[in-house]
């Protein structure tokens, strides 16, 4: 399955023949020079020694076309990786703590958040990383609303980014919200760009962001991370270790990352990744592999079900701008009709705990204190109950017409035929396709006229953010972050950035709870504003319980299953030293991905291929 990680409140890809494939190169003829990061004539495939090359998967489908760090759609390793561009800090979801990266320290106050940049941090061209680079990066979001850092400004979370001194950057919080959580999330997710490189390019583009984004930036990428782009083709992308990486001395006592090359082969399907992992041609991946316990030589975080750490909730998002999806009775009927056990056991191979109603993870040690089993039992609809689904349909005045046991149509209370509800999902995302098929089968059996609609991923993303759908499948806030679970509720429920169909938004994708519309529930936005400022734990539990209760009663989205942040899987045929639940020195994130980047310094060649 292909999955692209997105910055959601500021707002993941996959797939093996033998991975030692030739690539185009424009300048250098082989990987011998650490300083080269050019793309694309042919280099000898044998040049990449197996004991020097780590093969990763799950973050790239299709021929690479864009390495621009400001683009909304980027190729590996720019897309959510810390290999070339780095974030201010990283987040450890196992411990719920921030970890230094470009910023060596941070300070959260009632009206501001400050980050002090490590004086040792350098770009790979030798220039220092300074507060000016950080300020410039986030100021771009103020200037251009299409960039991923813009919601800090458009959401009115900050009013200013200023330099306290050359190495210290202070984000001034909006005086009415005083919400530091989105700033901390941004510090984890937004990769800092070099002002001395990007600003002249922006000027050359006439300060037009659309013109700037036409530059795919596949040559001489100036980043602060431990690797450089070496070469790419339609078959693979290769990065090469920067032996002068500033973090070697700061974090690892001068030690270099173990792999000289980190390579992402480009394949057609999850099946290819499965074969690659089993044969040892791919070392680690984040792709969905069904029945991982049956895959020879392939390991995961846990050695028994659910194998992966559940951290997200894939959902169906009804477009409440259109009838009948604006009817809460229909939405609750849809929720009751779904066979969640089939989804968990068949579609996702048991990689999930049983689903509970609401948007709080009841098994997560950091947020289970906010979950109320009593409320879920009394008010929740995320359980398979066909009779309850039919009762909700009846209350809403709907009539289902069957012939020979098959649903023919559904009529509303006026007797008018209800248009077939299409559920949109990307083609090729195999686990999502399976989920949607189970959902459609369940809904039709309960009398709800729904059909699947699988579309190309390039169309999916545009439709998702402009509300061009009846119902769409999407996972909000995929990466765990400092603001969890507040951010999950904010992305689903917030009316602060509500927009009509056709306008791009990264939150409230179903356009629920229009602040200027009838039936606006003001308490939702009140709670979303209050929770980040609550210090008393008992009051925080109370506030989350109320917010979760509102969600369950109104069912603006339909949670389907719990899912891993990423399907962290690996084989130790060529490299050893991956973290697991039995040895959790780092979280279950593939090398190069966020804090998982530090796995690269713990790996050792296995002495195999």
Regions found by a protein language model. Give the residues of each.
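Ligand/substrate-recognition segments at binding pockets and active sites
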Residues: 26-29, 233-234, 260, 269, ...
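Detector for C-terminal structural segments
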Residues: 33-41, 79, 233-237, 241, ...
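Surface-exposed binding/hinge segments that line
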Residues: 49, 107, 151-206, 226, ...
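N-terminal lobe/hinge region of extracytoplasmic solute-binding protein
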Residues: 55-110, 139, 222
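Gly/Pro-rich hinge or "lid" segments in bacterial periplasmic/extracellular proteins
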Residues: 92-93, 97, 188-256, 260-261, ...
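Extracellular/periplasmic solute-recognition and catalytic clefts
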Residues: 141-146, 151, 161-162, 230-240, ...
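Ligand-site clamp/hinge motif
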Residues: 215, 244-295, 440, 449-456
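Structural transition elements
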Residues: 227, 354-403, 427-434, 535
């Amino acid at each position: 399955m292909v999955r692209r990680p997105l910055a959601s409140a500021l707002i993941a890809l996959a797939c093996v023949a033998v991975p030692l494939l030739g690539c185009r190169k424009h300048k250098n003829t082989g990987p011998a020079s650490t300083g080269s990061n050019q793309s694309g004539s042919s280099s000898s495939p044998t040049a990449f020694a197996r004991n020097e090359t780590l093969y990763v998967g799950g973050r790239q489908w299709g021929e690479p076309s864009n390495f621009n760090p400001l683009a909304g759609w980027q190729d590996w390793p720019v897309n959510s990786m810390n290999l070339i561009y780095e974030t201010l800090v990283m987040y450890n979801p196992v411990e719920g703590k921030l970890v230094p990266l470009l910023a060596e320290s941070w300070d959260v106050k009632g009206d501001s958040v400050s980050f002090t940049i490590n004086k040792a941090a350098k770009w790979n061209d030798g220039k220092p990383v300074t507060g000016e680079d950080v300020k410039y990066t986030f100021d771009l979001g103020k200037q251009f609303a299409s960039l991923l850092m813009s919601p800090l400004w458009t959401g009115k979370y900050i009013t200013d980014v200023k330099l306290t001194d050359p190495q210290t950057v202070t984000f001034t919080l909006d005086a009415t919200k005083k919400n530091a959580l989105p700033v901390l999330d941004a510090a984890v997710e937004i990769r800092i760009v070099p002002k001395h490189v990007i600003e002249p390019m922006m000027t050359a583009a006439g300060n037009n962001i659309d013109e700037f984004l036409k530059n795919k930036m596949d040559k001489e990428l100036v980043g602060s991370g431990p690797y450089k782009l070496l070469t790419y083709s339609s078959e693979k992308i290769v990065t090469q270790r920067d032996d002068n990486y500033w973090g070697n001395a700061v974090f690892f006592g001068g030690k270099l990352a173990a792999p000289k090359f980190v390579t992402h082969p480009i394949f057609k399907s999850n099946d290819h990744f499965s074969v690659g992992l089993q044969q040892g041609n791919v070392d680690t991946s984040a792709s969905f592999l069904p029945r991982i316990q049956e895959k020879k030589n392939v390991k995961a975080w846990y050695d028994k079900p659910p194998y992966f750490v559940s951290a997200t909730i894939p959902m169906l998002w009804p477009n409440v701008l259109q009838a009948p999806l604006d009817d809460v009775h229909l939405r609750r009927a849809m929720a009751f009709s779904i066979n969640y056990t089939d989804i968990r056991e068949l579609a996702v191979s048991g990689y999930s705990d049983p689903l509970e109603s609401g948007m709080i993870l009841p098994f997560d040690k950091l947020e289970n204190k906010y979950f109320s089993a009593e409320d879920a039992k009394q008010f929740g609809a995320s359980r398979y109950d066909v009779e309850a689904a039919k009762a909700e349909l009846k209350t809403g005045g709907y009539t289902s017409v069957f012939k020979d046991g098959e649903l023919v149509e559904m009529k509303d209370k006026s007797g008018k035929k209800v248009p077939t509800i299409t559920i949109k999902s990307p083609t090729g995302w195999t686990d999502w396709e399976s989920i949607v098929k189970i959902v459609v089968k369940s809904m039709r059996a309960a009398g709800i006229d729904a059909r699947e609609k699988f579309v190309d991923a390039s169309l999916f993303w545009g439709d998702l953010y402009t509300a061009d759908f009846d119902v769409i499948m999407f996972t909000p806030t995929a990466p765990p972050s400092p603001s969890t679970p507040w951010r999950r509720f904010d992305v689903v429920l917030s009316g602060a950035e509500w927009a009509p169909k056709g306008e791009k938004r990264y939150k409230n994708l179903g356009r629920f709870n229009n602040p200027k519309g009838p039936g606006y529930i003001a308490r939702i936005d009140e709670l979303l504003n209050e929770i980040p400022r609550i210090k008393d734990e008992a009051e925080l539990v109370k506030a989350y319980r109320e917010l979760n209760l509102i969600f369950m009663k109104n069912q603006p989205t339909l949670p389907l299953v719990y899912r891993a942040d990423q399907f962290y899987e690996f084989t130790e045929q060529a490299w050893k030293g991956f973290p697991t639940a039995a040895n959790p020195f780092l979280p279950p994130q593939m090398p190069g991905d966020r804090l998982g980047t530090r796995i690269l310094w713990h790996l050792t060649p296995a002495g195999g291929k």
